[in-house]
């Protein structure tokens, strides 16, 4: 493999996983904080808020997993390598 392609692939993989985890991490923190605040205001709605929160966190985490898959493809099954 060309050293330039190899180094660009490693850099792209690092950016893919880094940027893919940045947004969902911030979003998960905000969502969790708002859920705790909502449960504190209305304790009787705790079950509904918690269920919605867990579903939302799963959707957010899937974005990070997509970034991880792209990074693994770039590192181990690079389509740009000859």
Curated annotation (Swiss-Prot):
The keyword Transmembrane helix applies. Keywords: ATP synthesis, CF(0), Hydrogen ion transport, Ion transport, Lipid-binding, Membrane, Thylakoid, Transmembrane, Transmembrane helix, Transport. The chain crosses the membrane at residues 3-23, 57-77. It is a multi-pass membrane protein. PROSITE patterns: ATPASE_C. The gene is atpE. Pfam families: ATP-synt_C. It is found in: Cellular thylakoid membrane. One of its GO terms (molecular function) is lipid binding. F(1)F(0) ATP synthase produces ATP from ADP in the presence of a proton or sodium gradient. F-type ATPases consist of two structural domains, F(1) containing the extramembraneous catalytic core and F(0) containing the membrane proton channel, linked together by a central stalk and a peripheral stalk. During catalysis, ATP synthesis in the catalytic domain of F(1) is coupled via a rotary mechanism of the central stalk subunits to proton translocation. It comes from the Bacteria. This is ATP synthase subunit c. GO terms for cellular component: plasma membrane-derived thylakoid membrane; proton-transporting ATP synthase complex; proton-transporting two-sector ATPase complex, proton-transporting domain. HAMAP family: ATP_synth_c_bact (MF_01396). F-type ATPases have 2 components, F(1) - the catalytic core - and F(0) - the membrane proton channel. F(1) has five subunits: alpha(3), beta(3), gamma(1), delta(1), epsilon(1). F(0) has four main subunits: a(1), b(1), b'(1) and c(10-14). The alpha and beta chains form an alternating ring which encloses part of the gamma chain. F(1) is attached to F(0) by a central stalk formed by the gamma and epsilon chains, while a peripheral stalk is formed by the delta, b and b' chains. The record marks 61 as: Reversibly protonated during proton transport. Belongs to the ATPase C chain family. The keyword Transmembrane applies.
